[in-house]
């Protein structure tokens, strides 16, 4: 799959970036290169290959070090009030934040 100039213009519009004709041409070449690489990766037979949790784990002895969740300090009503005093807005012991999803 190759992108044409109209595809790149549409992507730029959706991303809300303005591209000059020269930049559009370079972006088209770069995006087509990325798509070509993705096509090559999809063509590789990975049947029977164990997934990696970390990209270097195949070459080095890397294990994920997990720890138990533990309370590091006990919250008191005074410490909670002190923390909430730093908040621009709070109600009923909770931080109030602006709505971010419309």
Swiss-Prot record:
SUPFAM superfamilies: Glu-tRNAGln amidotransferase C subunit (SSF141000). Pfam families: GatC (PF02686). The keyword Ligase applies. Its EC number is 6.3.5.-. It comes from the Bacteria. GO terms for biological process: glutaminyl-tRNAGln biosynthesis via transamidation; regulation of translational fidelity; translation. Keywords: ATP-binding, Ligase, Nucleotide-binding, Protein biosynthesis. It catalyses: L-glutamyl-tRNA(Gln) + L-glutamine + ATP + H2O = L-glutaminyl-tRNA(Gln) + L-glutamate + ADP + phosphate + H(+); L-aspartyl-tRNA(Asn) + L-glutamine + ATP + H2O = L-asparaginyl-tRNA(Asn) + L-glutamate + ADP + phosphate + 2 H(+). GO terms for molecular function: asparaginyl-tRNA synthase (glutamine-hydrolyzing) activity; ATP binding; glutaminyl-tRNA synthase (glutamine-hydrolyzing) activity. Allows the formation of correctly charged Asn-tRNA(Asn) or Gln-tRNA(Gln) through the transamidation of misacylated Asp-tRNA(Asn) or Glu-tRNA(Gln) in organisms which lack either or both of asparaginyl-tRNA or glutaminyl-tRNA synthetases. The reaction takes place in the presence of glutamine and ATP through an activated phospho-Asp-tRNA(Asn) or phospho-Glu-tRNA(Gln). Heterotrimer of A, B and C subunits. HAMAP family: GatC (MF_00122). PANTHER family: GLUTAMYL-TRNA(GLN) AMIDOTRANSFERASE SUBUNIT C, MITOCHONDRIAL. Belongs to the GatC family. This is Aspartyl/glutamyl-tRNA(Asn/Gln) amidotransferase subunit C. The gene is gatC.
């Amino acid at each position: 799959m190759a992108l044409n100039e109209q595809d790149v213009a549409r992507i730029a519009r959706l991303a809300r970036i303005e591209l000059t004709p020269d930049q559009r041409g370079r972006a088209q070449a770069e995006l087509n290169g990325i798509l070509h690489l993705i096509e090559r990766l999809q063509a590789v037979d990975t049947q029977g290959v164990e997934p990696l949790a970390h990209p270097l784990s195949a070459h080095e002895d890397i294990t994920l070090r997990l720890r138990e969740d533990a309370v590091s300090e006990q919250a008191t009503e005074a410490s909670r009030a002190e923390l909430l005093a730093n908040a621009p807005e709070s109600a009923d012991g909770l931080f109030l934040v602006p709505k971010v999803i419309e």
